[in-house]
Amino acid sequence: MRKIFLLMFLLLISAVHSASATEVASPNGTLKVTFNLDNTVPTYAVTFRGKPVIKPSRLGFALVKGGDLLDGFTLVGEEKGSADETWTPVWGENRTIRNHYNEMLVRLEQKSTQRMLNIRFRVYDDGVGFRYEFPQEGKLNYFVVKDERTEFAMAGDHTAWWIPGDYDTQEYEYTQSRLSQVRQLMKGAITDNMSQTTFSPTGVQTSLMMKTADGLYINLHEAALVDYPAMNLNLDDREMVFTSWLTPDATGAKAYLHTPFRSPWRTVMVTDDARRVLASNLILNLNDPCKYADTSWIRPVKYVGVWWEMISGKGDWAYTQQYPSVILGETDYTKAKPSGRHSANNANVRKYIDFAAEHGFDQVLVEGWNIGWEDWAGNMKEKVFDFQTPYPDFDIKALNEYAHSKNVRLMMHHETSSSVMNYERYMDRAYQLMNLYGYNAVKSGYVGDIIPRGEHHYGQVMVNHYLEAVKRAADYKIMVNAHEAVRPTGLCRTYPNLIGNESARGTEYQAFGGSKPGHTAILPFTRLQGGPMDYTPGIFEMDCANGSHVNSTICGQLALYVTMYSPLQMAADFPENYLRYPDAFQFIKDVAVDWDRSLYLEAEPMAYITAARKAKGTDNWFVGCVSGNAPHKSQLSLSFLDKGRKYEATIYTDAPDADYRSNPKAYRIERRTVTSSTKLSLTAVAGGGYAISIVPKR
């Protein structure tokens, strides 16, 4: 009798569990998400072709007041649906993007409080997105999130490419290791930055790239980050379970919310082909469509600028070294002794304008044009810039008129020194000044600790600020390239005037001691998953004035214009360095910044990437390959070309004796006729690459 009772009890428990379990599969059936209530606790699991990717993982929230949203739930409703549509981005890697998914919405009620929580899952052929939705039902109105408790229980001790979890910077080099090794390697992975706040010996940032022992590629990230803090991941390295770790505010709280509210999407990309990670549109598809009726003023940009002069030690942002401190409206620069190192001066900027006009560039970025740079960094100074007053040697009116006469624009620069309240105070006046003089793009910066003091770069307050700056810029038809801001999560679909972000370790670090060769072969798998990066490639002179060395070859730099997608591309080096190598510089002049079609031909994280892209509105193709710490040999098929048509290919390759450390400027250029049946044998040296332009023959 006792055995019969036990059997009946187990059958009852099984029935309860099966009644609360529901699942949804991808359109092609390879990915499956299962939702369940495990003893009233919401959980989900993900499989790929029957293999576990995410083991049963808990979902929910700890709240500051009113009781948590972690357990005590019943399933009170379920909806399923699907969508298959095609949309056209304002700019992008492809002319059109397919948005094809199956969807499941589960409606939960916490019986003890009668509070409702919905969870929506969208399953694509290459990944999963899910988010929390808080309906306006009367029992939960205003609430404060103490912690989000979303778990990602991994099915093994995977290889991962990671950077330390941090509330203030992503400007780290990537470490490749097993998940179980993160703890022991964390200390060495943390390098100094002007603003950084790490939080755990096993905390890492998204986008997190992983590879399983049997060849699955898994990427964890988020999409549509709005009115919510950015998510890091904290690893339980015994169980191999990641838990979401939100960026706190100055009080330690994570998010102040009110219903109705939708969280950002949590994303799990899964594929058995690394190339599909790079080609995925999962993050973009999970964002809302474009909010603007008129986007005619948003255009991709290829630009040059004085920036590398300051970064590499040739010049300064500041006009004078006379003043140890500056008071806006009181410091008299007309009485200051110029240092002679100020790069943003009339003669120098005219030189860059002339260079841009002669070589077909759209804009010239001028940093250091405005007063206040003498004490701008590291002082937690609130009133640091006014974004309106130029230095005495920068004639803003005359220089813009000169640029426009040559069909070139100047690009504005708004470094905030992270004094956010100050920037918001001047923002409209700064944008109005841009309209007055014909600027249509601004590079903003957030160097240093955030003011209001105690806030972090990736907290809810700052996430809202970055988006407000983009939306307000749109009122003035201005495009934004935000540096040191929160890492992108696909919002460029919704707000396409956000044409660039830094939000990672860019080329500037090549002048601060250098980055490892594999860095540019991992960024497209990680940082670029959320949106394009203003990486600022194109350095030809690898030995910087400050003694640092750029760990790349010239051909490796050329390849970045194809492998590192962005509608905003800079030729970052000095004009005179390009004029020394005019044949190699020709590729930078020719390469497009907007595309009809993009293909990833070869890829392995941190090892190599080969991409081919068709320039928008033309039949011209461009190919780029970057290599990591080891050489990479390609047997490159040109089968993507139109059949029956002949093309002229200009092939830029590392010379056999090229070496990123000792002989980085050794390259070869070959021209040959190619067709869709052509196969090319090409080699990129370690830290190098190759680039090809392919144009139809007339």
Name what the model sees in each region.
Residues L6-A15:
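Bacterial N-terminal signal peptides
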Residues E23-A293:
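N-terminal accessory beta-strand-rich subdomains and adjacent acidic, glycine-rich linkers
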Residues H258-K351, H359, Q363:
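An acidic-aromatic substrate-binding cleft motif
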Residues N348-W369, L436-N440:
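Catalytic domains of carbohydrate-active enzymes, especially glycoside hydrolases
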Residues E367-T553:
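Aromatic- and carboxylate-enriched substrate-binding clefts and catalytic-loop regions
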Residues C555-E602:
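Catalytic cores of secreted or luminal carbohydrate-active enzymes
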Residues P605-Y647, Y690-S693:
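Carbohydrate-binding surface patches
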Residues R671-R698:
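C-terminal beta-strand-rich structural cap/linker in extracellular carbohydrate-active enzymes
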